[in-house]
């Protein structure tokens, strides 16, 4: 099985994005973040992405519909049904060809507490891979200033899953950042001023890092501008793809022609709206 055959199969099962990262390139990661802690025989990590329809953000962008479209087609159903089905189908396709693959959702576990190793030298449970590093290692994109993962195809509009496999294939080259360019449009777009580039840090795959602004998670949890807190199954993190910071990013990337997907009318068709921490309108 070649990487081209794998990618063609994934696309036939509905994947919009497919990348491959070798586990050897990820050997520098600590045990708690390393795919080999889950599957020591793995040779590659396959990253599968499905895009978030731009239309799923239309209601939030214009302040007309805040829950149904994005919550289902941009997040919950997209991850739990459409992306899961694509990943499952690729998994079964690989096993039918004699290769094992471990399927994993790409959940954000930033800041979550870890357990205690069962013995010295073992990773602290639970091992949950940093999907942004995996996706960048697989050549799919970069982490932007706002902390969201950006691809050349869709900007921040995608969801990811992963397969750890013992199949030996040609891996993709890591993605060198060029999309965000620290344009900074996300920073003033946040009515709560939750992003602080001056206190930011470098993040990403080793040698391909980019600046990520410090973020006040407590403010994000109280955001009334398209963000919402996920359930415990997703570690109660803040989902921000529809938030003001992300929508400003989508508009900025489109305006300078940085995203490959072209849609007839621009994403931003009117002045952005915003609400402060108590829900009052802001200019």
Predicted regions and their residues:
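Non-catalytic, usually N-terminal nucleic-acid engagement modules in DNA/RNA processing proteins
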Residues: 1-83
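Long, internal scaffold/assembly segments composed of regular secondary structure
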Residues: 277-282
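Catalytic cores of enzyme domains
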Residues: 29, 72-274
């Amino acid at each position: 099985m070649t990487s081209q055959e794998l990618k063609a199969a994934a696309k036939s099962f509905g994947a919009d994005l497919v990348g491959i990262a070798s586990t050897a390139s990820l050997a520098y990661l600590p045990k708690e973040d390393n795919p080999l802690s889950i599957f020591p025989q793995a040779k590659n990590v396959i990253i599968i992405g499905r895009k978030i329809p731009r239309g799923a953000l239309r209601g939030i962008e214009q302040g007309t519909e805040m829950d149904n479209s994005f919550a289902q087609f941009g997040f919950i159903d997209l991850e739990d049904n459409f992306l899961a089905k694509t990943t499952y189908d690729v998994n079964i396709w690989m096993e039918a060809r004699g290769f094992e693959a471990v399927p994993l959702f790409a959940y954000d576990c930033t800041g979550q507490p870890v357990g205690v190793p069962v013995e010295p030298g073992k990773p602290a449970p639970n091992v949950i891979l940093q999907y942004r590093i995996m996706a960048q290692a697989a050549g799919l994109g970069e982490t932007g200033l706002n902390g969201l993962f950006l691809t050349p195809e869709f900007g921040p509009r995608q969801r990811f899953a992963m397969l750890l496999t013992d199949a030996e294939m040609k891996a993709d080259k890591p993605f060198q950042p060029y999309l965000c360019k620290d344009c900074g449009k996300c920073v003033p777009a946040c009515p709560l001023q939750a992003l602080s580039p001056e206190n930011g840090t470098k993040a990403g795959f080793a040698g391909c890092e980019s600046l990520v602004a410090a973020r006040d998670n407590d403010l994000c949890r109280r955001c009334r501008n398209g963000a919402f807190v996920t359930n415990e199954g997703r570690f109660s993190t803040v989902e921000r793809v529809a938030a003001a910071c992300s929508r400003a990013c989508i508009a900025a990337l489109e305006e300078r022609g940085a995203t490959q997907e072209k849609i007839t009318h621009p994403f931003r068709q009117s002045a952005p709206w915003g609400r402060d921490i108590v829900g009052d309108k802001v200019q």
